[in-house]
Amino acid sequence: MSGASSGTAIGAHLFGVSPEYRVLIGDGGAGPSKSLSEVSFSVWYRSRAARLVILCLVASFLVPCLTFLIAEAVMGQTVTTPLSLTLDHWSEVRARAHNQGVEVRKKKWITLCEAEWVMMNVGWPREGTFSLDNISQVEKKIFAPGPHGHPDQVPYITTWRSLATDPPSWVRPFLPPPKPPTPLPQPLSPQPSAPLTSSLYPVVPKPDPPKPPVLPPDPSSPLIDLLTEEPPPYPGGHGPPPSGPRTPAASPIASRLRERRENPAEESQALPLREGPNNRPQYWPFSASDLYNWKSHNPPFSQDPVALTNLIESILVTHQPTWDDCQQLLQALLTGEERQRVLLEARKQVPGEDGRPTQLPNVIDETFPLTRPNWDFATPAGREHLRLYRQLLLAGLRGAARRPTNLAQVKQVVQGKEETPAAFLERLKEAYRMYTPYDPEDPGQAASVILSFIYQSSPDIRNKLQRLEGLQGFTLSDLLKEAEKIYNKRETPEEREERLWQRQEERDKKRHKEMTKVLATVVAQNRDKDREENKLGDQRKIPLGKDQCAYCKEKGHWVRDCPKRPRKKPANSTLLNLED
């Protein structure tokens, strides 16, 4: 028994447990009985493996719990902003910018949104925004002419505007709500209601009776003075209308067309708004044929906005249309989306009291209204309103003609082989107007236009322009003069052909001279070779005849009998006598 107890004690000591644990494993010997808690504490205290196992169990339980709690806390505190939204979808933002021909970088994107645009003091928040008003304010700072502009930020603000105007699905929930339309001010006095047969065009005042001419008119002459003669009045009924069933009133355009067909002799040709007798303006609306010709003989606004803008500018200057005519002109020549862009850009240019563009809605609605105003072109105030309206409309057309910045399209404009420098410069400026928001006539953009003009010219002009001394001090007109000089000094096709022929002739002469030298060398070598062979041939033996001497070359004897051949003297032989 004592041996078993000692063995158990030794085993307990080896496994790091208390000797009292022998009671739990069935030691029948006498000894103190310990409780389970005391035994567990003893195992925890003495066994390192037990402590390690318990710590691992506790850690495996606490780590997931803490991770879950931290994740819940972080997710509960994260706020999605326009800036973070664009960073989460950065690949789509870069693709959108690439489609517009520009490149953006994430680091600069963050810097501009959080710092530089905020410091412009135009209301841009640090977290970014998709509000078109804030984007427009930042654009004004970026597109400012001269040294106050920021051309390097153009790709980033254009990409912001693209995300706001053509938002993808992940941007739409963060767009600001549209502003409610501004209510029109109520007139102080009630306006008289228009009759059912009234037209949208202003009422033509009744002209005064014409003064009798000094000279009697020639009835046989078909000519009239369009600048001084009052046009014939519109036909009207003379006397009370006939009694009978009343027909519905026709539209003004249909009435004018019907009257023109019925009474062609009494109808005058439609002319622009101009002053008639007694300085009273006369008014004729646009004809359908004019609108059709303008639309069919000019490219669409989306294809060539500059050409259509120039056309509308000439129409506004020569015809001096009213507000209704301007709407009719825009509706005939532009699409719905293009009209909205033009009107939006025009309302941005409404001047305030200080002459700068204003943001006051009442001033904008009063100066450039979207609904038909009560402007009478017969009064100076009405004509002044129409003049300012037409100027703003032209500004809106030029603003809407600016496409997203695409410098790649500008770089593709290169000078043709036979194109003059002046024509190339005009095409280059047109590309700047069409594909960038910059004005090539602005002195602040002269450096970029000069670089494009130099590096995109034809190779011969480019090489000579780059070698000019003091190139930094040249203006665009100076470079154009130098390019014209280089272009005019170009050789004609006949001169080029003659130069090539002379060069080919010189090349042939040089080749002939080289071939002559080679042939002379070969002939000299052959001559030396023949000379050596002849020399060796002289030294060879000539065959002898049958009766010819090999020594003296004479015939009649052989060499052994030749008398000219020296003969050897015979040696004196001494005979020995054997007897001696």
Swiss-Prot record:
Membrane topology (Cytoplasmic): 1-51
Composition-biased stretches (Low complexity): 194-203
Swiss-Prot/TrEMBL keywords: Glycoprotein, Host cell membrane, Host membrane, Membrane, Transmembrane, Transmembrane helix
Segments passing through the bilayer: 52-72
GO cellular component term, pick one: membrane
Protein's UniProt keywords contain Membrane: yes
Annotated glycan sites: N134, N572
Function: Plays a role in viral particle release. Presumably acts by facilitating the fission of the virion bud at the cell surface.
Annotated protein name in UniProt: Glyco-Gag protein
Biological classification of the source: Viruses, Riboviria, Pararnavirae, Artverviricota, Revtraviricetes
